[in-house]
Amino acid sequence: MLSPANAKNQRLVSLEDVGVLRGGRWLVRGVEFSVSRGEIVTLIGPNGSGKSTSAKAAIGVLKPDEGRVERLSGLKVGYVPQKLSIDWTLPLTVRRLMTLTGPLPERDMQAALEAAGIAHMIGAEVQHLSGGEFQRALMARAIARKPDLLVLDEPVQGVDFSGEIALYHLIKSIRNASGCGILLISHDLHVVMAETDTVICLNGHVCCRGTPEAVSRSPEYVRLFGSRAAQTLAVYSHHHDHTHLPDGRVLHADGSVTDHCHPEDGHHAHDSQEHAHGQDHVHAHEHSHDDHHGHDHAHEHAHSRSGEGRHA
């Protein structure tokens, strides 16, 4: 256990060489990262890459089969799931949603809803909320009990571009107001929240890590989407020293092929290096669009997504 303290930048959770084995197959292996108080860490990768698995291992929902996870003693976690099973035919108000996991003082409920910008919707039925409003309700539910660590599993899914910007702005506000650490999971491989301190690209292991390039540096992006978008979103450029083959094996830069990519095999040096918080570690080069188990990465950026849809 990590020792309790109130200092800013205090480490909340740390993963060291973590692996999760299920059905004779490694879902993730050799995963290393940490989240400190006031820090935002974003996990990106294709579907099935181990993002949610790694996050669940970090907060103790999954027990790793190898490696070590250390957490702050008495760590309080707020969790916004990727999907929430709700019977939409039954009436469920925002107020009731806030107390599904237990009673909550009225003052704390009101404060959380106010922080999420939906205090006026406390009596609304959740099935009538838009995608963005529902995500705000889930976020209010997660922060109501004042967590040290906030885990957000694809929080901007089902919202349009402007809604995505607004939600990222909300996440930033929550971090600034509470000082909590944030572990954010995203399926978007190239466009991430600009306030992210560290981006970690996963595909069964840590493929690369670094800091995002601020979109605000691109005049074209600012002209197209405005300064608020430029201040909220950022571009992350990948640097992989290996290629994932269609059969799941890994082709390394030296021409060798292995069944997986693991720090101990000597091919993946940067996995074992701890990324310094705040260090400028941007990898600028073209990202191969078919290097993750044969998945096609050529997907639309955030600005070309369809309009706001229903929540999951």
UniProtKB/Swiss-Prot annotation:
From the Swiss-Prot or TrEMBL record, state where the protein is found.
Cell inner membrane
Q: Name one GO molecular function term.
A: ATP binding
Q: Name one cellular component (GO) term.
A: plasma membrane
**Compositionally biased tracts (Basic and acidic residues):** 243-312
Q: Where is this region: Disordered?
A: 241-312
**Which residues participate in ATP binding?**
45-52
This enzyme catalyses: Zn(2+)(out) + ATP(in) + H2O(in) = Zn(2+)(in) + ADP(in) + phosphate(in) + H(+)(in)
Q: Where is the ABC transporter domain?
A: 13-228
> EC number(s) of the enzyme?
7.2.2.20
Look at the named UniProt entry and state the broad enzyme category this protein falls under.
translocase
> Pfam families per the record?
ABC_tran (PF00005)
Q: Which Gene3D superfamilies match?
A: P-loop containing nucleotide triphosphate hydrolases
Q: Which residues cross the membrane?
A: none
Keywords attached to this entry: ATP-binding, Cell inner membrane, Cell membrane, Ion transport, Membrane, Nucleotide-binding, Translocase, Transport, Zinc, Zinc transport
Q: Tell me the GO BP annotations in alphabetical order.
A: response to zinc ion
- Xref: SMART domains: AAA (SM00382)
Quaternary structure note:
The complex is composed of two ATP-binding proteins (ZnuC), two transmembrane proteins (ZnuB) and a solute-binding protein (ZnuA).
- Function noted in UniProt: Part of the ABC transporter complex ZnuABC involved in zinc import. Responsible for energy coupling to the transport system.
The name this protein carries in UniProt is: Zinc import ATP-binding protein ZnuC
Name the lineage: Bacteria, Pseudomonadati, Pseudomonadota, Alphaproteobacteria, Hyphomicrobiales
